[in-house]
Design a protein with these regions (language model features):
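Hydrophobic beta-strand residues in large extracellular and virion-surface proteins
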Residues: 35-39, 103-107, 119-121
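Beta-strand elements of well-folded, non-transmembrane domains
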Residues: 39-43, 109-111, 125
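A short, charged, amphipathic alpha-helix used as a generic interaction element across diverse proteins
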Residues: 74-98
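Bacterial Sec-dependent N-terminal signal peptides
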Residues: 16-40
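Post-signal-peptide N-terminal segment of Sec-exported extracytoplasmic proteins
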Residues: 41-83
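Short, low-complexity, Pro/Ser/Thr/Gly-rich segments in the mature regions of secreted, periplasmic
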Residues: 121-137
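Sec-dependent bacterial lipoprotein signal peptides
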Residues: 1-22
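A short amphipathic beta-strand at an alpha->beta junction
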Residues: 96-114
Length: 137
């Protein structure tokens, strides 16, 4: 379990660095974004390949740039981070197995109109629930 926790910590640091870099700034309109990634995995049992594939597919659907074309950088960063985390979860499945996890991505524009993009995936006991909420404030 310690090896699992240390590996998860290393991957989380790498994902955070990736996410912050991806969601750094939008050169087109000089908007700054902040991306927060939260990942929680409980080691309970193996995911099937089909479940991992479904999770990856859901993560790839996390970007709907057409809904907010001016926020394309935030949308793209959110999708890329979701894909990166999904790949990491597949690695955990191959190495340790996991039956319950959740992760949340939040990308917030910190100048101009607030645009909060939240992508949330929950896998628990054989079912996958996905939420992709966008709230303009």
């Amino acid at each position: 379990m310690k090896k699992f926790q240390s590996m998860m910590a290393v991957v989380l640091v790498a994902l955070m660095a990736f996410a912050v870099q991806s969601c750094g700034s939008d050169d087109d309109n000089n908007q700054q974004y902040k991306l927060t990634v939260t990942l929680d995995i409980t080691d309970k049992g193996p995911l099937t390949d089909a479940q991992c594939d479904a999770m990856r597919s859901d993560a790839q659907k996390g970007s709907t740039v057409a809904d907010h074309p001016t926020d394309a950088s935030a949308e793209t960063a959110t999708m890329r981070a979701a894909q990166a985390i999904s790949e990491a979860l597949v690695l955990y499945k191959d190495t340790y197995g996991s039956a319950k996890f959740t992760y949340t991505l939040v990308c917030t524009k910190v100048s101009g109109n607030k645009q909060i993009i939240t992508y949330y995936v929950e896998y628990n006991a054989g079912s996958i629930n996905t939420y992709n909420n966008k709230n303009a404030k």
